[in-house]
UniProtKB/Swiss-Prot annotation:
Subunit structure: Homotrimer.
This protein's encoding gene: glmU
Coiled-coil zones: none
Provenance organism: Psychrobacter cryohalolentis (strain ATCC BAA-1226 / DSM 17306 / VKM B-2378 / K5)
Residues that hold UDP-N-acetyl-alpha-D-glucosamine according to the record: 10-13, 24, 79, 84-85, 106-108, 142, 157, 172, 230, 336, 354, 369, 380
Chain positions recorded as acetyl-CoA binding sites: A383, N389, Y390, S408, A426, R443
GO MF terms, alphabetically ordered: glucosamine-1-phosphate N-acetyltransferase activity; magnesium ion binding; UDP-N-acetylglucosamine diphosphorylase activity
Family matches, as InterPro entries: Bifunctional_GlmU (IPR005882), GlmU-like (IPR050065), GlmU_C_LbH (IPR038009), Hexapep (IPR001451), Hexapep_transf_CS (IPR018357), MobA-like_NTP_Trfase (IPR025877), Nucleotide-diphossugar_trans (IPR029044), Trimer_LpxA-like_sf (IPR011004)
The protein, known as: Bifunctional protein GlmU
Length: 458
């Protein structure tokens, strides 16, 4: 029978060096809170319960997680006094099952991988396992001291290390997998008899060794998995490290970046082969790119699906839209939520489309607003066409059937329908339905005054 798994996330720190009114764990990395990264990762495992220890800004932290992770059963425990990591875990004991095991994680160490946590859990065969790392410069970090047989016997802090111990390059990450029975046994015994007068979680290691427990240690695949965030410089550095990892994975899948250091992925991005991404492009949420997609500079693409062989020109914003194959977009186009562009359609410069469907091969080339509309196949929408969809209270639909032609600078006042192969003359204001194959115009008749003289200054 598999042992039950609890996750304890320590998220009580203020993050004074961030100089922010927002709790440190709510600072964002790749478009997601630091705490959100930890929750998403650990819940790729089979987790029975999650306990989050909160402190400074606890209401903000709870509100954020309740909104973003309402589907997760989370137990909240307050650490009213910041008395060290050992104390932070100790306050969870009233909520922690007596059996099973717990992963102890940190809300400001966001990039530990699911694979690493699974390996750490599997390594816990005698009551405790821990995540360590061998580094070139261990100064200031707790060293892992081993006996002559290679077993862990203690964690030595920098200030307590002798000259030999200071040469040790294996350091403690602070991430553990521990049997709950041992946590219930050891944590009440922690002492704050030290210079900082804090309760150190690392003290449970020497307690376990004294009980004859063999502590397993594993190392993560990447150094950044154990990097914490204490200030904005560290946050920015970790952001670039993570972006580099995301970009490298996409390059291996066949995506070409004009400059891998000048793109941001703030969510998940999957892409087909022979995709090109120019500089300054930002992806947010869940984005999917087909094969041979070409994205030029400065575009923002959020929660969108882009079909094969699409060309997105500079400075387009695409938000929660679905784009078919062979579509041309932009430059400076704005696709708002619930927009669908069918295959081989075209949306040109300074066009805004909201909650509308553009049919196969249809074109909205210049300076138009299309909202709450259904446009058929082979339709041409001229420059400056506006669908007037809002009367101040209600939104109404505009329907344009196949092969219609809408002349430039026309206003279509919804609700209205333009029939199949109908033509709307340029400059018209259309307030009534237009029959199929008809020509409709609604504008003042042109008059002309010959020999007209302009006013002159007196």
């Amino acid at each position: 029978m598999t042992s039950s798994l609890s996750v304890i996330i320590l998220a009580a720190g203020k993050g004074t060096r961030m100089q922010s009114a927002k709790p440190k764990v709510l600072q964002t990395l790749a478009g997601k809170s630091l705490l959100g990264h930890v929750l998403d990762t650990c819940h790729q495992l089979t987790v029975d319960d999650t306990i989050i220890v909160h402190g400074f800004g606890g209401e903000q932290v709870q509100d954020h997680i309740d909104q973003q992770y309402a589907h997760l059963p989370i137990t909240w425990v307050a650490q009213t006094e910041q008395l060290g990591t050992g104390h932070a875990v100790k306050v969870t004991l009233s909520e922690l099952p007596k059996d099973g095991q717990s992963l102890i994680l940190y809300g400001d160490v966001p990039l530990v991988s699911c694979q690493t946590l699974a390996t750490l859990q599997d390594a816990n065969t005698d009551g405790m396992s821990m995540l360590t790392l061998t580094v070139d410069n261990p100064f200031g970090l707790g060293r892992i001291k081993r006996d002559k047989d290679g077993n862990i016997e203690a964690i030595i802090e920098q200030k307590d290390a002798n000259s030999d111990e200071q040469q040790i390059q294996e350091i403690n990450s602070g991430i553990y997998c521990v049997d709950n029975a041992l946590l219930h046994k050891f944590l009440p015994k922690l002492s704050n008899d030290n210079a900082q007068q804090e309760y150190y979680l690392t003290d449970i290691v020497k307690m376990a060794v004294a009980d004859g427990i063999t502590i397993a240690a594993i190392e993560p695949e990447h150094t950044f998995e154990i990097e914490g965030v204490n200030n904005r410089q560290q946050l920015a550095s970790l952001e670039r490290t993570w972006q580099g990892k995301l970009v490298a994975d996409l390059q291996e899948a066949g995506v070409q970046f004009a400059d891998p250091t000048r793109v941001d992925i703030r969510g998940t991005l999957s892409a087909g082969q022979d995709v090109f991404v120019d500089v300054g492009v930002v992806f947010e949420g869940d984005c999917v790119l087909g094969d041979n997609v070409y994205i030029e500079a400065g575009c923002v693409i959020k929660n969108a699906q882009i079909g094969n062989a699409c060309h997105i020109k500079p400075y387009c914003v695409i938000d929660s839209a679905e784009v078919g194959a062979g579509v041309d977009i932009g430059p400076f186009a704005h696709l708002r939520p619930e927009t669908i562009l069918s295959d081989n359609s075209k949306v040109g410069n300074f066009v805004e489309i909201k909650k509308s469907t553009i049919g196969d091969g249809s074109k909205v080339n210049h300076l138009s607003y299309i909202g709450d509309a259904t446009i058929g196949t082979g339709v041409n929408v001229g420059a400056g066409v506006i669908t007037c969809n809002y009367d101040g209270v209600n939104k109404s639909q505009t329907i344009i059937d196949d092969n219609a032609f809408i002349g430039s600078n026309s206003s279509l006042v919804a609700p209205v329908k333009i029939g199949d192969t109908a033509t709307v003359a340029a400059g018209s204001v259309i307030t009534k339905n237009v029959d199929a194959h008809a020509l409709a115009f609604g504008r003042a008749r042109q008059t002309q005054k010959n020999d007209f003289k302009r006013p002159t200054k007196k």
